[in-house]
Regions:
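A short, highly charged, low-complexity intrinsically disordered segment
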Residues: 206, 213-216
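Acidic, proline/glycine-rich low-complexity IDRs
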Residues: 218-248
Length: 248
């Protein structure tokens, strides 16, 4: 995979797990008329609604089970909450993005049991797509609700904040491209809409062993197609996905 990282900006780092994909393959057969399993048995995604992401902020109401899934004992949640609140908008963004790899690794070291099923992923956006992020920020500004609550626009999302640092993604194991839909944050991936069926039928490519897209050209086609058919409200973008060891 010929990727020039200097052409990309980091959109943050997150901690997730593999997603068991049997039900999604069956759904694509039942609803999207797929004639074969198009995805591997387990996938990785930075935006799939069925994926689990490591909980960071208590005010987004994670369950105790969410912490346990990532090996965080209940007696450490209070310390994690204080740490995360201190770093909010400085090193960590809403809802689950670390601006830098070192902060994600600090989270893993301090609060988790470093279980082998955790996956530390980085998100990269090609600079040619930055204008779409700017348009999204302009189209979804912050506002004050009728109750007086301050509602952050897209510019206040962790994704947008990380991009404004203008840092290249850290070097790691490049897994491929995800295609994600942005509205308030990263709200969906192309798998939320079964678009692997269109990848095969319209664009003649299959997802790779991670459920991602192997090359930028196909990822661009899929993002533009999802935008064209308006499969979700929001802006569709192809993002580079890189995997890192949990510890340096």
């Amino acid at each position: 995979m010929d990727i020039h990282l200097e052409d990309y900006l980091s959109a943050g780092y997150l901690i997730t797990q593999f997603v068991d994909d049997a039900s999604l393959n069956q759904w694509m057969r039942d609803v999207n008329h797929a004639t074969e399993d198009l995805l591997p048995s387990r996938i990785l995604s930075v935006g799939f609604c069925g994926a689990s992401f490591a909980p960071i902020f208590k005010w987004v109401s994670p369950l105790v089970e969410d912490y346990a899934r990532f090996g965080i004992p209940e007696n450490r949640i209070s310390e994690l909450t204080s740490w995360a609140n201190e770093l909010f908008d400085k090193e960590i963004g809403h809802p689950n993005l670390f601006f830098r790899l070192r902060t994600a690794r600090e989270y893993i070291r301090r609060f988790t049991n470093q279980s082998s099923d955790m996956q530390l992923l980085g998100i990269g956006l090609h600079q040619e797509r930055l204008h779409q992020v700017h348009e999204l920020e302009q189209g979804r500004p912050g506002y004050v609700s009728e109750t007086g609550a301050k509602v952050t626009g897209f510019a206040g999302s962790g994704f947008a904040q990380a991009l404004r640092l203008k840092e290249s993604p850290e070097r790691g194991e490049i897994l491929g491209f995800d295609v994600v839909c942005l509205e308030a944050n990263i709200d969906h991936s192309w798998h939320c809409n079964g678009l692997a069926v269109d990848a095969v039928g319209k664009f003649n490519f299959y997802p790779n062993q991670f459920g991602l897209i192997d090359n930028k050209s196909d990822a661009d086609k899929m993002a533009d197609y999802a935008e064209e058919i308006e499969s979700e409200d929001g802006t569709w973008l192809p993002v580079l996905v890189t995997r890192y060891p949990l510890t340096p």
